[in-house]
Amino acid sequence: VQQSLKLAFGENSAHVADGSIAAVQSLSGTGSCRLMAEFQRRFMPGCKVYITVPTWSNHHNIWRDAGCEQDTFRYYKESTRGLDFEGMVEDIQNAPDGSMFLLHACAHNPTGVDPSAEQWREISKVMKAKNHFAFFDMAYQGFASGDCERDAQAIRIFVEDGHKVALAQSFAKNM
């Protein structure tokens, strides 16, 4: 598990070094997401999860089966075949304070469209101001850019900005 933490948070991460990250092994991405959904239901009652439009279809099933309330937020803009950054930020700002957002760390499934580092910083800033919780699903580290470090930038930006985050890290597709 320690090597997985280093891959996600960085070889020289202070949080990895000081042991302040809790980590458990589960059954791939689906199992990790289900574990987070169960955690949310039990320890974050009343907290709605916001899921990108579109998303991997199992995300909705996992949170539904765990009994969690869910909603969606804009992500992909069909007309440009790119990120709907303005719509995404607007939806994050309009969500009730303390909501949870399921974010794809890289290689968004199914679009493959990812925010730039600058856009991730803005998303982090808006989420911090609203006291939102970020849950990252990272199934494709190394596939988006060909660089595992670059593909982990979203998570690292949020941690650097002082967020407490959760991460579902899977190696089913990149090993």
Describe each region flagged by the PLM:
Residues V1-N131, G142-F143, C148-E160:
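Conserved core of the PLP fold type I
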Residues A107, Y140, V159-M175:
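Active-site PLP-lysine loop of aminotransferase-like
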Residues D137:
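Active-site glycine-centered loops adjacent to acidic/histidine catalytic or metal-binding residues
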